[in-house]
């Protein structure tokens, strides 16, 4: 089900910057005040996964892109671009519904995502949980 929410051009531009420039480590997306457009809330060059998690509010929904870097045994360092759909249990119902119905618009606009993570609490987006998911999707 589509919500009619649009994706701002800045969302696409920052994603391309993350993909191609490798300077941005993560992007946090939110809805504008009128719930009509997905916008960039913040970008960061911090390589700390804890900094990224601190950007996910415990009572508000967000989308995020994270350039996840990890070691793959003898294969060395790997990177996976992960899409996060953050809809915490303590968020209000209406925003959760709008976020759920708007996710596909953003997800389809961002070409090059390798892994999707859905989180309702911090255990579902912990480093180890995400590492397990991205390393299983690697051949």
From Swiss-Prot:
The entry's keywords: Actin-binding, Cell cycle, Cell division, Cytoplasm, Cytoskeleton, Nucleus
Cellular component annotations (GO), alphabetically ordered: actin cortical patch; actin cytoskeleton; cytoplasm; nuclear matrix
Predominant localisation class: cytoplasm
GO biological process, one term: actin filament depolymerization
CDD domains: ADF_cofilin_like
One term of GO molecular function: actin filament binding
Subcellular location: Cytoplasm; Cytoplasm, Cytoskeleton; Nucleus matrix
Residues in ADF-H domain copies: 4-135
Disulfide bond positions: none
Record family assignment: Belongs to the actin-binding proteins ADF family.
PANTHER family linked: COFILIN-RELATED
Protein task: Controls reversibly actin polymerization and depolymerization in a pH-sensitive manner. It has the ability to bind G- and F-actin in a 1:1 ratio of cofilin to actin. Binding to F-actin is regulated by tropomyosin. It is the major component of intranuclear and cytoplasmic actin rods. Required for accumulation of actin at the cell division site via depolymerizing actin at the cell ends. In association with myosin II has a role in the assembly of the contractile ring via severing actin filaments. Involved in the maintenance of the contractile ring once formed.
Name of the molecule in the record: Cofilin
The organism's taxonomic lineage, starting at the top: Eukaryota, Fungi, Dikarya, Basidiomycota, Ustilaginomycotina
Designated gene of the protein: COF1
């Amino acid at each position: 089900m589509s919500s009619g929410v649009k994706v701002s051009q800045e969302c696409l531009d920052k994603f391309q910057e993350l993909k191609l420039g490798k300077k941005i480590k993560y992007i946090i997306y939110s809805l504008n005040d009128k719930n009509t457009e997905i916008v960039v809330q913040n970008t960061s060059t911090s390589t700390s996964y804890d900094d990224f998690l601190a950007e996910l509010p415990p009572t508000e929904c967000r989308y995020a892109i994270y350039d996840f870097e990890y070691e793959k045994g003898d294969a060395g360092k790997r990177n996976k671009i992960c899409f996060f759909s953050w809809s915490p249990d303590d968020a209000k119902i209406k925003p959760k519904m709008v976020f759920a119905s708007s996710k596909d618009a953003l997800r389809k606009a961002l070409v090059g995502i390798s892994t999707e993570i859905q989180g309702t609490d911090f255990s579902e987006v912990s480093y180890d949980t995400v590492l397990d998911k991205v390393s299983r999707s690697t051949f």
